[in-house]
Regions:
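A structural motif shared across PLP-dependent enzymes of the aminotransferase-like
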Residues: 30-33, 83-88
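Alpha/beta enzyme core
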Residues: 80, 93-94, 119, 123-127, ...
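Distinct, well-ordered alpha-helical segments
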Residues: 113-119
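Short glycine-enriched loops at secondary-structure junctions
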Residues: 79-81, 106-112
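A short, Lys/Arg-enriched amphipathic alpha-helix followed by its capping loop at the start of a domain
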Residues: 71-73, 92-101
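An N-cap/entry alpha-helix motif that binds or orients negatively charged groups
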Residues: 1-69, 170, 177-211
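Hydrophobic faces of well-ordered beta-strands that scaffold small-molecule active sites
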Residues: 73-76, 101-105, 130-134, 158
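Short, acidic/turn-prone active-site loops that include or flank metal/cofactor-
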Residues: 109-111, 134-138, 164
């Protein structure tokens, strides 16, 4: 049966995906209190229609950072899409391009950012380019190289994740012994820069409580 809602897609994913993979996508840190609170907060939001306005067909499009979007709903960054689909983030980019909205590509993508951007352009050349999520790494030279790749790929913006001074204590992942990607999958954007970058083993993510406004100044100036 074809899913017609987000809840339906979630149920279908639970049936199709490996249990540990589903828990990775569906889970959060500790007791998942914040995740449940977020869902409850969104559920309390109501859309109150205006009546007798004579406005014709509704128009959902918006202008964002100088680009036209067909919907004000963006796709947030999520890691490791190839765990769920063989084309990984490229499939997500094509879907977002077809919908006329922005995909925010995760720094922990299983496809290089240049290929993600190219996949969206191939599907819909005039669609808004993906944005790139960034975790500033302690090695600022390496971080700068990652930002340079996103710029060269044509990303429309950087989305800085500043709320992760440490890796979350994800209890579902711990129970499932989900500590790393399976063989053949890598965080492609974390490869070392240089001529041998494609062959180089990706670096591990590093989270630091040292992140401050000084890092924002560095990012703006580079």
């Amino acid at each position: 049966m074809r899913s017609v809602s987000l809840r339906g897609l979630e149920a279908e994913a639970r049936e199709r995906l490996d249990h540990a993979v589903y828990d990775f996508f569906a889970g959060a840190a500790e007791d998942e209190t914040t995740m449940r609170a977020n869902e409850a907060a969104y559920a309390r939001i109501g859309l109150v229609p205006r009546v007798l306005r004579g406005c014709g067909a509704p128009e959902l499009g918006v202008s964002l950072l100088g680009r036209r979007l067909e919907t004000p709903v963006l796709v947030a960054p999520t890691a490791f899409h190839r765990l769920a689909h063989p084309d990984g983030e490229c499939a997500t980019a094509r879907a977002c391009a077809a919908a006329g909205t922005v995909m925010i590509a995760a720094m922990a993508s299983t496809v290089p950012i240049a290929e993600i951007v190219a996949a969206g352009r191939e599907r819909a050349p005039d669609s808004p380019a993906p944005w790139f999520q960034l975790y500033i790494q302690p090695d600022l030279d390496f971080t700068g190289a990652i930002v340079g790749r996103a710029e060269a790929a044509g990303c429309g913006a950087l989305v800085l994740s500043a709320d992760s001074p440490a890796l979350g204590h994800r209890e579902r992942d711990l129970r499932n012994a989900f500590h790393d990607l399976p063989d053949g999958l890598r965080c492609e954007n974390m490869r070392a820069p240089g001529p041998g970058a494609v062959q180089a083993r990706p670096r591990s993510f590093q989270f630091s409580p040292e992140l401050s406004w000084a890092h924002m100044d560095w990012l703006r100036e580079r």
